[in-house]
A protein has these predicted regions:
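A short glycine-rich, His/Asp/Glu-containing loop-to-beta-strand
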Residues: 275-316
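Conserved Rossmann-fold NAD(P)-dependent oxidoreductase catalytic core, especially the SDR/UDP-sugar
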Residues: 85-127, 134-137, 142
Length: 402
């Protein structure tokens, strides 16, 4: 399959082309039914000769080219309708009736706040042109009215509030929110790309529109991405501020799989300047070694790393409800446990040469001993709760009694 992508250097185009090329080059094997031979990437620096050749040769077209923020409103029609005419005329020239996807916008509904949108009018004109092309040629046309888009590589201070918020907060720049209660419908770039790949496999999702509302149905003349999220401007900004504090608090917010928060967090991180991609952690250092907290979570505890100097014993305490897992990743050590009120000592010899996890059982006093005379003992420690100095649940008691 040979695929033509117009607007290939735009936000959607870059992400889609990356996905298509990963499949073409065998780096992405999750869609075995897709065999991609060529990805033709058309943009402003391409020539009409190239467009002509690619329109003759292609098996599928993603038309993402368009104008979002022109200097003059008249450029909307030229950029969003004019190029579409050129594209379709070139396909007709070669009698190439391959499927064509059109990137449109919710604003093409021309309803509500979009009633007087010049951008919306140009997009609606493009839709009508493509649908007319479909009726006259029999070519399959997929018209997608996208809501607000967000994700990596989206240009800030252009036409995405999320991109602007992420960029500005990541770079310590001011943001402006006039009404935090305004709700947006948001489509994540990976979900959009997944739908485009579905379309290549003839698994696109069809619908009609009642105003801005999607009415799903297999006979709908439009198409849509089934996974979107709704959030207010205030909620979006609050989440991004939480993400920005993570290097200080170590707290990873709840980001369930598929959630808006997870997608927004990844988006925010893509705007971090290089100096913020590295940050210091607080090492608690003494003559025995060091203890450093790495990550805190809201409901699943924390992860730390412990370094013990040669011959050092750490621990010698027990917990009621708290429990831990010790994973030695470097060095040679001994982990000991003893159930409170008993004399039997459990001994677990551990080494970075064989990674194992030892559970510090509730009600068992425990320690960890560096058996080496020359090397540090490095241990990753998981605890089921974040340490709370007001409720430490930690009680001193040596494992081995004198």
């Amino acid at each position: 399959m040979k695929i033509l992508v117009t607007g290939a250097k735009g936000f959607v185009g870059k992400n889609l082309c990356a996905a298509l090329n990963n499949i073409k080059d065998g780096k992405d094997k999750t869609r075995p039914s897709l065999v991609i031979d060529e990805v033709y990437e058309y943009d402003l620096d391409s020539t009409l000769v190239e467009l002509d050749s690619w329109c003759k040769d292609c098996d599928f077209v993603f038309n993402l080219a368009g104008v979002n923020r022109p200097k003059d409103n008249s450029e909307f029609m030229k950029g969003n309708f004019g190029f579409a005419s050129t594209l379709l005329d070139t396909l007709k020239k070669y009698k190439n009736t391959c499927p064509v996807m059109l990137s449109s916008s919710q604003q093409a509904s021309l309803t509500g706040r979009f009633g007087n949108s010049e951008y919306g009018r140009s997009k609606k004109a493009g839709e009508d042109l493509f649908l007319d092309y479909q009726s006259k040629t029999g070519a399959k046309v997929l018209v997608y009215r996208f809501p607000n888009l967000f994700g990596k590589w989206c240009r800030p201070n252009y036409n995405s509030a999320v991109a602007t918020f992420c960029n500005n907060i990541a770079n310590d720049l001011p943001i402006q929110v006039n009404d935090p209660s305004v709700e947006l419908e948001l489509l994540y770039i990976d979900d959009l790309v997944a739908e485009m790949l579905d379309a290549l496999e003839e698994k696109e999702h069809h619908c009609e529109f009642e105003g801005l509302e999607v009415v799903a149905g297999p006979l709908g003349k439009y198409c849509y991405c089934p996974i979107t999220h709704k959030a207010t401007l205030g909620e979006i900004v609050d989440l991004i501020h939480q993400f920005a504090e993570q290097p200080k608090t170590l707290l990873i917010p709840e980001i369930p799989n598929g959630s808006f928060a997870k997608k927004l967090y990844s988006t925010y991180l893509s705007y971090l300047p290089k100096e913020k991609a590295i940050f210091d952690l607080k090492m608690n250092v003494d003559q025995r070694g060091s203890f450093t907290e790495l990550v805190h979570t809201l409901n699943c505890g924390q992860v730390s790393i412990n370094i013990s100097k040669p011959g050092i014993t750490k621990g010698q305490h027990w917990h009621n409800t708290k429990w831990e897992q010790f994973i030695v990743v470097s060095g040679h050590g001994l982990i000991q446990l003893r159930k409170e009120g008993t004399d039997e000592v459990l001994n677990y010899e551990v080494s970075g040469d064989k990674i194992q996890s030892v559970i510090m059982l509730p009600g068992y006093t425990h320690n960890i001993i560096n058996l080496s005379e020359t090397e540090d003992l490095v241990t990753v420690m998981y605890c089921n709760e974040v340490f709370d100095s007001s409720k430490p649940d930690t009680f001193f008691d040596p494992v081995e009694k004198d």
